[in-house]
Each structure stands twice: as structure tokens, then as C-alpha cells.
Amino acid sequence: MTSATIPGLDTAPTNHQGLLSWVQEVAELTQPDRVVFADGSDEEFHRLSAQLVDAGTFTRLNDEKFPNSYLALSDPSDVARVESRTFICSEREIDAGPTNNWMNPSEMRTLMTDLYRGCMRGRTMYVVPFCMGPLGAEDPKLGVEITDSEYVVVSMKVMTRMGTAALEKMGQDGFFVKALHSVGAPLEDGQADVPWPCSDTKYITHFPETREIWSYGSGYGGNALLGKKCYSLRIASAMARDEGWLAEHMLILKLISPENKAYYIAAAFPSACGKTNLAMLQPTIPGWRAETLGDDIAWMRFGKDGRLYAVNPEFGFFGVAPGTNWKSNPNAMRTIAAGNTVFTNVALTDDGEVWWEGLEGDPQHLVDWKGNEWYFRETETTAAHPNSRYCTPMSQCPILAPEWDDPQGVPISAILFGGRRKTTVPLVTQARDWQHGVFIGATLGSEQTAAAEGKVGNVRRDPMAMLPFMGYNVGDYVQHWIDIGKNSDESKLPQVFFVNWFRRGEDHRFLWPGFGENSRVMKWIVDRIEHKAGGKTTPIGTVPTVEDLDLEGLDANPADVSEALAVNAQEWREELPLIEEWLQFIGEKLPTGIKDEFDALKERLRDAE
């Protein structure tokens, strides 16, 4: 079929010649049955969702409990980001660095072009214009995803500002990121489709210099919703390096004191370490309130006043379901319960609701994420996949900050880094200065989780929680953070802190209750910013004593809190070789500022008790 005979190509709702020629080129290569330009309307969402129900991809949920919501069950081989198949194809291998997979870009283009040839046969090719961040921004970051997955189109409406408004923003010649996606499952005449098409061959490829994303073979969230990690972190981090800003794997939280003063805090944690829970914090301290601006990604630019301002480029939440419940994150539950949600790989109850491990209730019978019968206390496997997800509109969140759609963003007072560590790392530490804060972030260690392939439980270094998401060399990335500090007024920069909610005692109990009680740590952070709270100087930074924290009304043993705050110099001396191994791995591009910080830490620990 030539492009001239592919229905839909000749009725494009745009005169953008660059877009039109790209769409035609892709259609000629992939050979879809038809081309549809997505408009982002509610009607389109309903129509495609109904189509997915008919295809067996979606199950419509109980409308009384989850209005306009659906459950999708993926192929068991397509359940998470595939870091081993994710590539940064920079022109030079050194620019991808040691943390990324690299292939020569011309070789990768040849290889993937062969995969794309005819790959949409029997399917509809959707052209999905979208904007990351508010449409009213001075420099809106636009993109177009071409995909053969209705699941992607529906999810992109939730996760991005998608459709006609984004297309109009592009005008006739505006720049956009080209994001090409196919599930890699062409259909021959008469061939029946499967509920979750995908391919055993998977590539998620980024070309940072040309700002392109090519994805093949996976229908799963992070591999297929190309506005998310692919654009908002991997491509955007390369843009940010070139343009002097930061694209980071961070939540954005607004804390409001009893005096009604607002503080905006950005926090970077690896996946499944409590980002969404902190983003939707429900403070337990009287008089304190919290609102959310985002749970996953922050773009930070300097304002005219010299402060760092953050926006959330996303439009929805794509949260890990297991462990989310009315105690751990009531605001996430309220957001989901408002409806318009796409669940993936959770379990289905007999009355058309969803369930996952950690959710209240003990259903006796379920259909699990693989579509099999599941019985309480009889079936040995989990009912929901550990990386199962909910995809839900941000606008439904009951504690959404009114500034969430402000193109100017919000001024950041503190940046938090955090990971999941049973030992060594105290509950909260304040960095000595910006460069020390960058060192803390660059050497962040966390026990591995189910959000990516790999062995659960291993501690891996995850700089700024960006290990899987840096679009260029890790050494250059860390140097960019240092340069952000050097090129600004340090008095206006956010204060940097490190938190660890997950420290355990010798009996393996969590020493800190976490969840809403984390507001007590946040209060100390705010009071440090205001120079109102005490703290103890330690070799790793300033750590509060038990007396420095507001523990009034806390149902916890002060001895446990003291242990959670402890800085054990011997444990840290044992940590030094692990940090050094990571710094050696970064290699020749390791910033001298980071080496200086490491040497200074060794010196401070040498004489510490």
C-alpha cells in the first residue's frame, strides 16, 4: 500500500509540513490500514476505551465505585521498563557514558527501520500531539507520538496535555520531539489479534542530539507512553544541559505552615521508595497542611529573581498500585476513586472492582493479573503484579495545589534525596552546602525494587534517582548540577537534604512509622530553612537529635527514633569503599568537585567515633 492509498493521510488537521512529511514517511514504512490524528477529546477516550473492551484488552469496572475506569492485563513478558533494552544513541559513545546502553546511531536506525518495516500492518496508526508542561509556557515542550496502540492513546490523554490544543501550539513550523512507537505485532489478513500485542524483540531508543525517541516491541507504560520517562527525563535532561536547567525524577510538594506560609519542596527517590506517598502527604502535625504539584518529574529553571522554579511536565499520575491504601496514601485513593482511571496488572474482584496487595479487605476470590482464578490463602502467587499501575488524572487529586498548571512554576526551598536503606543512612540529614548536596545525590544508594528488571534487594547507586533516566554521561550530568550552583547565588539555591524512611532495627522492624508522620521530618526541614531548628553536626552533615523533632502525639518509642537518627561512623567507613567503587565506575568524567567531597568525607570519618 502506498501512502496515497492509506486512509486518513489526506485529511490531516494541520498544515505543519515537518509533521506531515514525517507522518507520511512513517506510514509508508510501517504500512498501517489507516491513519488517525488524535484530538484528545472525551469522546475519543470513550470510543477507544469501548474498542479496547471489545478487543479484550480492557475490562470496564464497576461504575458506582470506579466511574469510567478500566483494567488492562498485559502480556506476562511486558510488565516493566526494560533497562537492558533501553539505549542512548548519542553521536559519540562517551556522551552516553557508563550508565547507559549505547549503539552507533546510524546502526540503530538501520536495525530499527528494518523492524518497523510493515510493523503496523492490520492496525491503525495514531498521530498523538502532546505538550509536556503547561500549554501556556513561554517555551512549551511539544511532542508527537506515532503509535499503533489504542492503550497508549487513551493513557496519553490522562498523562499529557494531548490533542488539538497541543497541535495548534505547534503552528505551521514549531519544533516538536518525534516519538515513534509500535507494539511490533503486525496482523496479516484474517489473523486474530491478542488482547495485549507486543514483541519478544524490544528496543527503547533515544537520539539526544536530534531529540528523537524510537520504541519498538513493548506496550507497557514507561516503554510506550513516550512523553513520560523517554521525553520528560532522558530527552529533556539533554535539553536541560544545553539550555541551563534541570529535568529531574522528583515529586513537587507544597507545605503550608500554621502561619499560612508556603514552602515548595522537590524530592528525588528511586521508583517505589515513597515518592507518591510524600507527594500526597497528609500531615499529622496540627496546623500543617500539604498540597501536591506532582509525584514523579520536575523541570526546574531559574526565575528572574535568581531562584529555582519547578513545574511538573505531566498531567496525570502513573503510580505503583501495591502498597497504596487508605492509610498509606488516602489522597491517591481519593484521586483514583474519582474515576477516569486506567489500571494495569492489578486484580479484578467478583463485583467489578480492583484489588492489589496492601489494599484494605481480604477478597476470597479474584481474577489475578494473569487472568487466572485466585483464592485467598490458597493461591501462592500475588494477585497483582508488583509493578502494577494506576493511570489517573492529576486534576482529580483533592489536595492539588492551585499553582499546578502555572507555567512560571513554583520556587523551590528544599531538594530532598532519598532511598531505601535498612542501615547506615539516618532518617534525615542536611547537606553542608550545594556541592556537598550534589555529592549526596550523586552517591545515593537504594535497595532495588520491582519497577525495573533486576534482583530485588540489592543496593545500587542511583544518582539523583536518575540512573535509568539520564540522557547523557553521568559525569557530565553531575557536573551540570555543580555548575547550576556555581552559576547562581548560593543564598537563593534550595537547601539540600537526604532522607531515609526505611531504616530498621536489629529485629528488622522499621524504626520510623513513616507515611503521614513524615510531616515531622518535613517540619524540621522547613525550620532549618528558617534557621529555627537545631541539629547535630556529624561527618555526613547536620542531623537532628530526638529533641529537635516535633514528636508530640507520636506513637513511637523515642529510643527507636534515636536509632533512626543515629550516625554510626563505623558503618559509614564501611560504606566508603562502596561509594569509591561507584565513583570509579563513573570514570574519567567524574567531576573534581565530587572527588573533593569524597576525600573530605573520608577525612571527617577518620577521626569520628
Swiss-Prot record:
Substrate binds at residues 81, 220-222, 271, 387-389. CDD domains: PEPCK_GTP (cd00819). The lineage of its organism: Bacteria, Bacillati, Actinomycetota, Actinomycetes, Mycobacteriales. PROSITE patterns: PEPCK_GTP. It comes from Mycobacterium ulcerans (strain Agy99). Binds 1 Mn(2+) ion per subunit. The active site is at residue 273. This is Phosphoenolpyruvate carboxykinase [GTP]. Its cofactor is Mn(2+). Catalyzes the conversion of oxaloacetate (OAA) to phosphoenolpyruvate (PEP), the rate-limiting step in the metabolic pathway that produces glucose from lactate and other precursors derived from the citric acid cycle. GO terms for cellular component: cytosol. It comes from the Bacteria. It catalyses: oxaloacetate + GTP = phosphoenolpyruvate + GDP + CO2. PANTHER family: PHOSPHOENOLPYRUVATE CARBOXYKINASE, PHOSPHOENOLPYRUVATE CARBOXYKINASE [GTP]-RELATED.
